[in-house]
């Protein structure tokens, strides 16, 4: 480590904390990063429309804060003198734990920065652990739009401006009985003055090398607290509410009177907590009447959020499935990324109780959002929630225990066919056409490895869920066999079929339409059927299929064995996302089903079995042929104008190490595959024009003349023949 080099210890999972680490690394700072969301190669990738793609490797990286002891301690003494400690936690519990553990690595010259992007007055908690072990504790707010794309991959969505604000969010008047906090106020005031050589000054100089990054030092704690409440109130009152109501158009959401009442009550409670905590009001959200009276202007809060959203739309490629233009909280909820929701919702409740302010609506919102995360298989405190399913899920499918059936691999018999027939003409009003039924209502949170793997994050389990199976069977019954249903399904969508207009949309029909049917094989020994194995049992690594974002419409009368593609995607998008690694699973499934029965002993038994399984055998050889085309053993037939474009994309993918463009969300930014296609559009169109024509244009003219000559000769021959 160089002399006078700024040493920063960054602990946190939020994109803002990762962003600060990235920018500090470019200023030659010594970065010690603690984050579980970094890949094993220790590379942190950032993408930006203006800055391009950037990678950096922290000087020291650990995934768990407890591992710091082996890297920062030697014979009980600290190996490095830490200048800056940046803490950004997911929950209040993890925040306290992090502060307690980090206090062993600080010294009298260390400045502790607490991320207050999701909470106000967090410094007293940190001071209780760092008091006497550091120079001071200061709050930091980073107003920048960052999004996590995947493990160790982030996007800087809005790189036009970034404001870094430092200050204190607590008021001394509320802590007169705490000398430690009062001492921190004095030390922080000196540090915030930006004296030459101070840690804060060196920290900001490293960040503001880029001209679009600005910094603010607020010496008045009341103004800093007001600034934080100005950011927090719209997040809680509108963004969290939009997640619950699944409506991201704020004006449409507030057209509902009950929703509007909840929104206004939340704003009133939050402004009341703000006034009790810092003794000031947010002038931006107030309307001053002619008599000098002030009242809350709810429209300004809506306009504030709409303005932020418009900035995102103007600066992002708003394409499925990233949804980068969504506000930070809905984006994280959609992608199942962790963010400090517990601090965002629970810290105001703690402050309300401390200062004697009513917060009944905020309490209800916190409980409701916590339950919503629980049903999604996540915990508001971070990590996975073990109780992902509701007890009401057992009612799905006419009283069938879906959870136990899927976990055990048990087949569903046709005992509910009568109920299904009775309900054919009934349309569930709660399930609209093309609507989406949550996976948490249909599947348990099982590991893609076939066992409960506690090491697998819940968000990955959510993506993998149901992606390791594929249907290959006809829904028709053959040989008079009884229809049975398999509980597993995943649609690769190779076929592009249109659906009939008489599609019935009831809850039972949509659920049963997603079930596979093995009776097409003519197998009547279902009692001995083995549970369906996941892909990994065949040595195939499953990549998330993201099936929960698609809605498959299927008619209850549809008996074809064709796989239905998601109607929300285009043909090209579907071919790009088709899972070629499923070939081995398809082939193994058909092979197992084809030779399911005991090996025939006589030729007549063999012939009978071949007649029964002729269609299945044909499917198996088609899959084998398709697989040979995929691996290049056979040429791919030119059946549509997309084929050459797909070849071009394959070249781009294979030229990128590790197939990153295929399997990660890198369709955004300067390295985007689609962006490359647009740049090469003229070349691609010339390629299509040349390759789609099987012969040069001159030969076409010669062939046309030859065909005309042959046709004239043939007509002359027929005329002469008839004349005779």
Swiss-Prot record:
GO terms for cellular component: cytoplasm; prospore membrane. Residues 407-427, 477-497 are annotated as: Disordered. It comes from Saccharomyces cerevisiae (strain ATCC 204508 / S288c) (Baker's yeast). This is Outer spore wall protein 2. It is found in: Cytoplasm; Prospore membrane. It comes from the Eukaryota. The keyword Nuclease does not apply. One of its GO terms (biological process) is ascospore wall assembly. The keyword Iron does not apply. Its main location: cytoplasm. May be involved in a late step of spore wall assembly. Keywords: Cytoplasm, Membrane, Sporulation.
């Amino acid at each position: 480590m160089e002399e006078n080099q700024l040493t920063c210890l960054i602990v946190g999972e939020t994109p803002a904390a990762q962003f600060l680490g990235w920018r500090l690394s470019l200023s030659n700072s010594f970065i010690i990063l603690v984050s579980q969301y970094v890949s094993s190669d220790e590379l942190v990738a950032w993408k930006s429309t203006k800055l391009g793609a950037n990678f950096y490797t922290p000087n020291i990286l650990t995934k768990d804060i407890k591992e710091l002891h082996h890297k920062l301690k030697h014979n009980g003494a600290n190996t490095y003198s830490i200048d800056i400690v940046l803490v950004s936690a997911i929950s209040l519990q993890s925040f306290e734990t992090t502060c307690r553990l980090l206090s062993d690595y600080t010294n009298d010259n260390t400045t502790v920065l607490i991320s207050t992007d999701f909470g106000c007055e967090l410094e007293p908690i940190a001071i209780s652990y760092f008091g006497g072990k550091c120079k001071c504790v200061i709050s930091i707010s980073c107003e920048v739009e960052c999004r996590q794309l995947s493990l160790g991959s982030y996007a800087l969505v809005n790189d036009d401006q970034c404001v870094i604000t430092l200050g204190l969010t607590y008021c001394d008047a509320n802590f007169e009985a705490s000398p430690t906090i009062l001492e921190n106020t004095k030390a922080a005031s000196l540090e915030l003055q930006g004296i030459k050589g101070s840690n804060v000054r060196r920290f900001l100089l490293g960040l503001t090398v880029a001209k679009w990054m600005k910094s603010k030092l607020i010496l008045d704690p009341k103004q800093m607290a007001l600034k934080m409440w100005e950011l927090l109130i719209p997040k809680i009152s509108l963004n969290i509410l939009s997640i619950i109501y699944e409506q991201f158009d704020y004006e449409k959401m507030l057209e509902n009177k009950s929703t509007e009442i909840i929104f206004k009550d939340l704003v009133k409670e939050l402004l009341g907590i703000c006034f009790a905590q810092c003794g000031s009001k947010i002038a931006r959200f107030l309307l001053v009447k002619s008599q000098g009276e002030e009242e809350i202007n709810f429209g300004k809060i809506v306009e504030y959020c709409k303005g932020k959203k418009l900035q995102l739309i103007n600066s992002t490629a708003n394409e499925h499935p990233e949804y980068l233009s969504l506000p930070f909280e809905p984006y994280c909820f959609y992608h199942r990324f962790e963010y400090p929701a517990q601090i965002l919702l629970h810290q105001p409740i703690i402050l309300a109780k401390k200062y004697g302010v009513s917060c009944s609506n905020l309490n209800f919102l916190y409980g409701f959002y916590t339950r919503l995360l629980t049903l999604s298989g996540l915990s508001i405190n971070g990590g996975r929630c073990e109780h992902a399913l509701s007890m009401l899920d057992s009612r799905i499918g006419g009283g069938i225990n879906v959870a136990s059936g899927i976990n055990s691999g048990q087949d569903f018999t046709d005992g509910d066919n009568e109920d299904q027939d009775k309900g054919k003409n009934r349309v569930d009003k709660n399930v609209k056409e093309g609507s989406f039924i949550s996976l948490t209502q249909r599947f348990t949170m099982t590991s893609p490895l076939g066992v409960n793997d506690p090491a697998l994050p819940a968000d990955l389990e959510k993506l993998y869920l149901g992606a390791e199976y594929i249907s290959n069977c006809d829904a028709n019954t053959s040989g008079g066999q009884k229809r049975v249903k398999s509980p597993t399904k995943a649609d690769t969508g190779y076929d592009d079929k249109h659906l009939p207009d008489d599609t019935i949309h009831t809850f039972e029909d949509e659920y049963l339409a997603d079930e596979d049917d093995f009776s097409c094989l003519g197998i009547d020994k279902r009692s001995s059927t083995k549970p369906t194995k996941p892909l990994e049992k065949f040595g195939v690594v499953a990549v998330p299929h993201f099936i929960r974002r698609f809605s498959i419409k299927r008619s209850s009368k549809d008996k074809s064995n064709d796989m239905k593609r998601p109607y929300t995607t285009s043909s090209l998008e579907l071919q790009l996302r088709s899972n070629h690694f499923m070939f081995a699973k398809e082939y193994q499934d058909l092979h197992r089903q084809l030779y399911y029965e005991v090996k025939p002993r006589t030729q007549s038994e063999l012939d009978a079995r071949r007649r029964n399984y002729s269609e299945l055998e044909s499917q198996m050889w088609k899959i084998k042929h398709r697989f040979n085309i995929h691996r290049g053993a056979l040429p791919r037939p030119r059946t549509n104008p997309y084929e050459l474009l797909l070849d071009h994309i394959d070249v781009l993918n294979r030229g990128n190490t590790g197939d990153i463009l295929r399997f990660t969300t890198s369709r955004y930014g300067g390295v985007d595959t689609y962006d490359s296609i647009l740049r090469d559009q003229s070349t691609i169109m010339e390629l299509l024009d040349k390759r789609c024509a099987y012969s040069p244009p001159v030969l076409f003219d010669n062939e046309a003349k030859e065909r005309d000559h042959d046709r004239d000769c043939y007509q002359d021959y027929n005329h002469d023949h008839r004349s005779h």
